[in-house]
Regions:
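Glycine-rich, basic loop-to-helix element that forms the pyrophosphate-binding segment
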Residues: 70-87
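Short, flexible, basic/aromatic active-site loop/helix in glycosyltransferases
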Residues: 125, 143-164
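Conserved donor NDP-sugar-binding/catalytic core segment of glycosyltransferases
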Residues: 104-138
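Donor nucleotide-sugar recognition loop
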Residues: 168-169, 180-199, 207-210, 214-217
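Short beta-strand-to-loop acidic/aromatic patch adjacent to the donor-nucleotide binding site
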Residues: 90-100
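A recurrent flexible, glycine/aromatic-enriched loop bordering the glycosyltransferase active site
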Residues: 155-174, 190, 196
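Short beta-strand/loop segment that forms part of the nucleotide-sugar
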Residues: 36-45, 67-69
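Short, well-formed alpha-helical segments that are part of the catalytic scaffolds
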Residues: 17-30
């Protein structure tokens, strides 16, 4: 690992990737804390453009691991889980292919929030609205991803209720040892595998950190 730092892998499920994935891969390699490996779980080999993405890793300190899946084998929880099992890093960051780091500090700030306490199992980034998103989407992002960081645990259930378990599959970091101990993401989940895992972690006495200074832009267009 760089400078004796903790080893970090980034796991990205990809389906018919395009410009966003290229932008994401370029920005990940410019992070102040560079990932050791980027593991791409790609659905259907024919949609992967090797000439476009693989040269981005030539001469890079970050390695590419590419795993092709059949479409029927893809599901949100199970595919990410396979990626985490493929990793040997202490920390795994799961990102969607349309999540773009807002600046060069995303990985550093996300990992710092995760490492701030031994009992923190996961940390998730702040989602910034894309410049051209609508008013309702902007409001929802601001509501779910406020400007102040916080750590959530069992003691917050009375006040926050189900929001205690809020996490994000757009950009979140996990301590791999705790993840494996708790059994990881539920396979065959269509969505919310991150919140199901967060609920399991909180009930087991762990905490979830929201890192407001780790910023990603999700642009679905």
């Amino acid at each position: 690992p760089e400078n004796g730092r903790i080893k970090i892998d980034v796991i990205i499920p990809a389906f018919r990737p395009g410009d966003k994935l290229e932008q994401l891969l370029k920005r990940l390699q410019k992070q102040t804390w560079r990932p050791n490996r980027i593991i791409i779980m790609n659905t259907e080999r024919q949609y992967w453009n090797a000439e476009r993405y693989e040269p981005l890793f030539e001469g890079s300190e970050t390695e590419l691991t590419l795993i092709h899946l059949a479409q029927e084998d893809f599901d949100h929880g199970g595919t990410r889980h396979r990626g985490i099992l493929e990793s040997d890093a202490e920390i795994c960051i799961c990102m969607t292919q349309d999540a773009i780091p807002h600046n060069r500090e995303l990985v550093k700030n996300l990992v710092s929030a995760l490492m701030a306490g031994e009992d923190i199992a996961a940390s998730y980034a702040r989602q910034l609205p894309a410049a051209d998103c609508g008013v309702i989407e902007r409001f929802t992002r601001d509501f779910n991803y406020p400007g102040i960081s916080r750590v959530k645990g069992k003691e917050d259930l009375e006040i926050l209720g189900i929001k205690t378990y809020f996490c994000s599959n757009v950009c979140a970091a996990y301590k791999r040892d705790i993840y494996l101990k708790l059994g990881g993401f539920t396979a065959k989940t269509v969505f919310n595998e991150d919140m199901i895992y967060a609920a399991t972690a909180v009930k087991a006495g762990y905490k979830i950190a929201y890192a407001a200074n780790a910023e990603a832009i999700q642009d679905r267009k």
